[in-house]
Design a protein with these regions (language model features):
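Residue-level signal for secondary-structure boundary sites
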Residues: 29-31, 74-76, 112-114
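Short, surface-exposed ligand-recognition loops at beta-strand->loop->(often short) alpha-helix junctions
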Residues: 24-35
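Short, well-ordered beta-strand segments in beta-rich or mixed alpha/beta enzyme
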Residues: 17-24, 53-82
Length: 114
């Protein structure tokens, strides 16, 4: 599930970075999904996320969006390196509750020029 995007080295200090992961859940697995995604919060925070949340789409009740913030692009790249086997196993269980691959987006804070 991790999506590693190569950034130009000059961009590594940019931040903060908001990562969104959109899940289309299997409706009958909703309770299992929510239980597991809240366990995943601990992993995100351990690996550097300062904020974390899971939200559902009011127009499409089986669509959930995980959102977390990290301090910089470099810190987000390090998150991928910190994944343990236990994290991977939990992630595989999470994937079994969704229909199709999650959609990951990376948004870097847009600063005004001084």
């Amino acid at each position: 599930m991790p999506v590693v995007i190569q950034a130009d080295k000059s961009d590594l200090r940019q931040g903060p970075v908001m990562v969104t992961v959109e899940y289309q859940i299997i409706p009958e697995r909703k309770a299992d999904f929510l239980d597991l995604i809240h366990q995943y919060e601990r992993i995100r925070r351990r690996d550097g996320a300062s904020e974390w949340g899971i939200f559902y789409d009011t127009e499409a009740g089986d669509r959930y969006v995980e959102v977390f913030l990290v301090s910089s692009w470099a810190e987000h790249q390090r998150q991928h390196e910190r994944q343990t086997q236990a994290d991977h196993d939990l992630e595989q269980r999470l994937v079994s509750y969704i229909a199709g691959p999650p959609q990951v987006r990376h948004l870097i804070y847009a600063q005004a020029k001084e």
